[in-house]
Amino acid sequence: MRVTDFSFELPESLIAHYPQPERSRCRLLSLEGPTGALTHGTFTDLLDKLNPGDLLVFNNTRVIPARLFGRKASGGKIEVLVERMLDDKRILAHIRASKAPKPGTELLLGDDESIHATMTARHGALFEVEFNDPRPVLDILNAIGHMPLPPYIDRPDEDADRELYQTVYSEKPGAVAAPTAGLHFDEPLLAALREKGIEMAFVTLHVGAGTFQPVRVDTIEDHIMHSEYAEVPQEVVDAVLAAKARGNRVIAVGTTSVRSLESAAQAAKNDLIEPFFGDTQIFIYPGYQYKVIDALITNFHLPESTLIMLVSAFAGYQHTMNAYKTAVEQKYRFFSYGDAMFITYNPQAISERP
């Protein structure tokens, strides 16, 4: 399959630069996987689409202020984007500079250049940086870091983004991008879902900056997926198996929840799904056999991205591309701060190719 098969025309005006004033009032495009039927509504329509006993699986990662600005002690300006925190003193990061720093290079970070760090090693495209500061890494990032808004949100980050670019249930710091399908859930909607008898479970996948990297090959089978850390604890496994046993659906909130659950299913030896703690490089594209999820809540993704490929593998290629064409025509808002989709599984998707 060619990467260009997953291209579509997207007017710049449809890229959302700010979220809706009220999280749950975004638009919702529902796609019935087996038939391709589309319906238009608002996000709170989920209350009517979910049945008592259905299981929503959320990603409870929390976005860290992962973008740092500063300079090398020798003078050159740098921009640091944390990929992951290694421990209380060290990070793995992308560094943008006119000349890549060498191991041993001293870095001065923050608006006042008060934070001192050392680039200690290079690992391919990533740099290991150690802070020369008594505070834990997370405290330093909270003090001097900027929220790492995606490259397609063409504006500087603002103080409000520290909360707007977080899910209301975020709990475990470590992501450099929000699991954006979850941004639409507010406390009143979560309370209404619980009141209806909807079950909830939480995985963790710390979204890395690689999620924004373009696919740089022509044939998607040649693409090597970036690695991200995921946790699927025993209580999630129990909730999934219980939902399946009683005939209810497992609904992933966001592609990161999909990738967490399907990684746990791939690693399982004896059951449908088993606990999973570790890095995953799972790459889901048409032809993939979904094992766990029955429905998916997700935002609208970039053309030619691995995420639109994941959706195509779930709903079917033709249904997905038609839904995106309709979304553009109907002026849905795209990407992280945009509108959402609710998609049910298409069993025929596995045999469908572009």
Swiss-Prot record:
GO terms for biological process: queuosine biosynthetic process; tRNA wobble guanine modification. PANTHER family: S-ADENOSYLMETHIONINE:TRNA RIBOSYLTRANSFERASE-ISOMERASE (PTHR30307:SF0). It comes from the Bacteria. The gene is queA. Monomer. It is found in: Cytoplasm. It comes from Salmonella dublin (strain CT_02021853). One of its GO terms (molecular function) is S-adenosylmethionine:tRNA ribosyltransferase-isomerase activity. Keywords: Cytoplasm, Queuosine biosynthesis, S-adenosyl-L-methionine, Transferase. SUPFAM superfamilies: QueA-like. Its main location: cytoplasm. InterPro entries: QueA, QueA_dom1, QueA_dom2, QueA_sf. Belongs to the QueA family. This is S-adenosylmethionine:tRNA ribosyltransferase-isomerase. Transfers and isomerizes the ribose moiety from AdoMet to the 7-aminomethyl group of 7-deazaguanine (preQ1-tRNA) to give epoxyqueuosine (oQ-tRNA). It holds the Pfam family Queuosine_synth. Its EC number is 2.4.99.17. It is an enzyme of class 2 (transferase). Pathway: tRNA modification; tRNA-queuosine biosynthesis.
